A protein has these predicted regions:
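Non-catalytic accessory segments flanking enzyme active sites
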Residues: 57-161, 172, 259-292, 296-324, ...
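Blade-edge beta-strand/turn elements of extracellular beta-propeller
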Residues: 137, 188-200, 242-254, 291-303, ...
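Asp-box/WD-like beta-propeller blade repeats and closely related beta-sheet repeat scaffolds
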Residues: 136-158, 169-173, 178-214, 218-226, ...
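Mature N-terminal segment immediately following signal peptide/propeptide cleavage
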Residues: 24-76, 84-85
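Beta-propeller blade signature
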Residues: 123-126, 184-189, 231-241, 287-294, ...
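Polar, glycine-rich mid-to-C-terminal structural blocks
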Residues: 232-279
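Active-site-proximal cap/loop segments of hydrolase catalytic domains
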Residues: 517, 523-524, 530-726
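Cap/lid segment of the alpha/beta-hydrolase catalytic domain
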Residues: 144-165, 173-180, 189-192, 196-197, ...
Length: 726
């Protein structure tokens, strides 16, 4: 399939080139144009408006022409085919760890993709077979066979199985990787879709089991009945055998919400506890309500907690919340942001005003909570301390709360992969930049830890080392970053270096073993830096909040400070420094390219936001106003315009030649940001690379082959920009 695709690209190149309109002479310095949004009035016509039509003929002609041009240029480099082959070998390796997930009755599930199973297999084995090292798998669903039979490129998005047996599952399938999906009922015991079972057509929707014959469905029931973010806010009850037009409304949020839905709270055994409802007021504020008297209860109870508090677990009758802001209880007790708190849920619902939690964990200034999970009898927390991990197991009994630390590897990234609700076992991955992923099975009750398997080394890390450094940002804040380079690295400013970061939505960036990065870059003499800038979750809510809305320049200052520290240490210099980031990190890259074009020689901008004046009217952009602010607010809007990459390309300025990457089927951020930014560069005579995967959603790839092609394009570009000039 991949070879055919590339051959078609090459065959079509001549025809596209012949029909493409004449373009401005490309230089590294932007030329002045009347349609530059930096100068054009708000009411001026937009010559790039046709690119707003995702699948429009004119837009797709533009996309295809630039795809062809980019692939043609980069694939002529002999390294391209080498990188693609190496990446595909790594991604499709049959000796990689089959990531496990606990299923019922001592079974282990896995979703597997390789060269034969491009779209993947959902499969199952016994725990004994899995730990043997040579598991015998039974296929539950062959997504490739289903795709072929139905003429689709189905991407498996997961399954919600009805407890306690978990035989009936609601499977979510996305056409090409979009956020919108279809839902179908599947019987695992029979290995087939349920005849005349529950089926939901494509949409951005959520679905919850109530019982074997009832589901709650939140979707766009009436055309246009979605929030400004494009998500549903009306939940209806659907009974087995009913058509969707027979569904009965049970809950309605508000159109101004980000999203809203009615759901079900269950205990660890899968037993029904009560109904809940959720309203996303913005990305970080929610109204969570409980209905203590069951499905027919119309009396909702909202606890007097901050709307930023996150409901994490229901454990032994205790509600576990993660505080994202300070809160004072009715008794006057101050609970600080970042804390994990617990209280008796049913008692709190009976008398909400008297909620008085206990603190399970309060991070210090160097710590944050990375996640929580639950086994049959234990509550488990993953904790970051200076961006390295530890895992603690908590118990609640007659004597109150107690906890201990699990004996897992120190100074590594620990990921809670899956926990068992029928025992106290959980799977934990441990990894580092130079340490391949190792899978452990831990018993959260006894503390026993067993190594199950490890990923083979995919690149030569013998001469490499990973170190943590701290840069000083513009306002004096110390910002950590990791540097992976050769132990004997010459500090002469010529080391080709990729700097990566995200810096948003309280998402921490941690060390991880990237075999592709190691094989295609580190092994060949490149250095890699990972910046833990503000906006992320490395040090809890305060670290994130410091970069919200009109404070976002701090995020960009942090990134620049890390770059300047690398240059000051003579690790690298502008001719050899490239940057890369995706989604919110794509916005970060766009801002860096515009604000400090003198610092970088290569910029990879993946699935980005770039038009911050209009982002709320593009795809799901309205849902991120809690992070970025509102363009319609006078103060926030003025700031957003000042940092919007699309509105700050200036004539007479020399910019590095960027590489824009996006996906036609990305219905979260959407491809329009990247399209219009690239088109603006084109109109201003600036060179660039552009690649828009026709499938793949916000991940920009729908299968392993597409990921391999993307890696080959990116690293060929990086080598040309950063290594070929040594």
């Amino acid at each position: 399939m991949l070879t055919t695709f590339l051959n078609n690209l090459m065959m079509a190149m001549t025809m596209v080139t012949m029909t493409a309109p004449a373009q401005p002479q490309m230089t590294t310095v932007a030329t002045a144009i009347d349609s530059n949004p930096n100068k054009a009035s708000k009411d001026a016509s937009d010559p790039r408006a046709y690119l707003n039509e995702i699948d429009g003929d004119k837009a797709m002609t533009w996309v295809e022409a630039h795809n062809l041009s980019t692939v043609d240029k980069l694939s002529k480099d002999p390294r391209y085919s080498e990188y693609q082959a190496d990446a595909l070998t790594i991604l499709q390796a049959t000796d990689r760890i089959a990531s496990p997930s606990f299923a019922r009755n001592g079974m282990i599930d896995n979703f597997w993709q390789d060269g034969t199973h491009v779209q993947g297999l959902w499969r199952r084995t016994t725990w004994e077979s899995y730990r043997s090292g040579n598991p015998q798998w039974r296929t539950i669903l062959d997504v490739d066979a289903l795709s072929k039979a139905e003429g689709k490129t189905w991407v498996f998005e997961g399954a919600d199985c009805l407890p306690p047996t978990s035989n009936l599952c609601l499977i979510r399938l996305s056409d090409g990787g979009k956020d919108a999906d279809v839902v179908r009922e599947f019987d695992i015991a029979k290995g087939e879709f349920v005849k005349e079972g529950f089926v939901l057509p494509e949409g951005k929707q959520s679905v919850t089991w109530v019982d074997e014959n009832t589901i709650y469905v939140t979707r766009e029931w009436t055309l246009g009945e979605v929030t400004s973010s494009g998500y549903a806010y009306v939940t209806k009850v659907v009974k087995r055998g009913q058509s969707l037009d027979q569904a009965v409304e049970i809950f309605r949020g508000q159109k101004k919400d980000v999203s809203a839905e009615r759901g079900v709270l269950r205990d660890i055994d899968g037993k029904y506890v009560m109904d809940t409802s959720y309203r996303g007021l913005d990305f970080f504020n929610t109204e969570l309500a409980f209905y203590p008297n069951g499905h027919t209860d119309t009396r909702k109870v909202v606890l007097p907690l901050p709307t930023t508090a996150v409901f994490s677990s229901y454990y032994k009758g205790q509600a576990i919340y993660w505080l994202k802001s300070d809160w004072t209880s009715a008794k006057g007790t101050v609970f600080h942001n970042g804390a994990i708190i617990a209280f008796d849920l049913k008692a709190a619902l009976a008398d909400p005003a008297r909620v008085e939690p206990l603190v399970l964990f309060m991070p210090n200034e160097h710590q944050s909570v990375a996640g929580t999970t639950q086994t049959k009898n234990r509550l488990v927390l993953s904790i970051l301390s200076n961006v390295t991990s530890e895992v603690r197991s908590f118990d609640f009994g007659k004597g109150g709360w107690s906890s201990f630390k699990l004996a897992l590897p120190e100074n590594s990234t620990l990921s809670l992969t899956s926990s068992d609700d029928e025992s106290d076992q959980l799977f934990v991955f441990s990894e580092g930049f130079l340490e391949p992923s190792t899978l452990f099975c831990a018993d959260a009750a006894t503390g026993q830890v067993e190594k199950i398997t490890s990923t083979p080394e995919r690149f030569d890390a013998g001469g490499l080392q990973a170190q943590q450094f701290w840069a000083t940002s513009k306002d004096g804040t110390k910002v950590p970053y990791f540097l992976v380079a050769r132990k004997d690295v010459k500090l002469d400013g010529t080391n080709p270096t990729i700097l990566y970061a995200y810096g948003g939505f309280q998402i921490p960036m941690q060390p991880s073993y990237s075999a592709v990065l190691g094989k295609l870059w580190l092994e060949k003499g490149g250095a890699y830096a990972l910046a833990n800038i503000r906006g992320g979750g490395e040090f809890g809510p305060k670290w994130h909040d410091a970069g919200l809305k009109t404070n976002r320049q701090r995020v960009y200052d942090d990134f620049q400070a890390v770059a300047q520290d690398l240059i000051a240490k003579k690790v690298t210099s502008t001719p050899h420094l490239g940057i890369m980031g995706g989604s919110n990190g794509g916005l970060l890259m766009g801002v860096q390219m515009i604000q400090r074009p003198d610092l970088w020689n290569a910029v990879v901008i993946q699935v980005p936001l770039l038009d911050m004046v209009n982002f709320t009217r593009m795809s799901a952009g309205a849902s991120w106003q809690g992070e970025y602010g509102s363009p319609d607010d006078p103060v926030e809007g003025a700031f957003l315009r000042s940092i919007s990459p699309y509105h700050n390309v200036k004539a007479g300025v020399a910019y590095p030649e960027p590489f824009f990457e996006t996906s036609t089927k990305d219905d979260r951020v959407g491809p329009v940001h990247a399209r219009k930014m690239a088109a603006l560069f084109e109109d201003m005579g600036l060179p660039f690379y552009y690649y828009e995967n026709i499938e793949g959603g916000h991940a920009a790839a729908a299968n392993l082959q597409e990921h391999a092609r993307r890696y080959a394009l990116e690293y060929t570009y990086m080598f040309q920009k950063l290594m070929d000039n040594k």
